[in-house]
From Swiss-Prot:
Pfam families, sorted: UPF0253 (PF06786)
Domain of life: Bacteria
Homology family: Belongs to the UPF0253 family.
Segments forming a coiled coil: none
Xref: NCBIfam families: PRK04964.1
Name of protein: UPF0253 protein PC1_0961
């Protein structure tokens, strides 16, 4: 858990404690979030590219593993 930033660790603790809602479709949540980042023209292109690359890799790994 230490490899993740403070914000991720804090939200993890809140979800684990029940203070924040848990989303059962975590892969769908991640893909929707990465897609939103990749589509956001207000963000730097490098950030958008990273999000798109991560989303595409998730889609490939999910498809290949089925």
């Amino acid at each position: 858990m230490q490899e993740y930033c403070e914000l991720v660790r804090r939200l993890y603790a809140e979800i684990a404690s029940g203070d924040l809602g848990y989303i059962p479709d975590s892969l769908g949540c991640v893909l929707k979030t990465l897609d939103g980042i990749a589509a956001n023209d207000a963000l730097p292109s490098s950030v958008r590219e990273q999000a798109a690359f991560a989303a595409a890799n998730l889609l490939v790994s999910d498809y290949v593993n089925e």
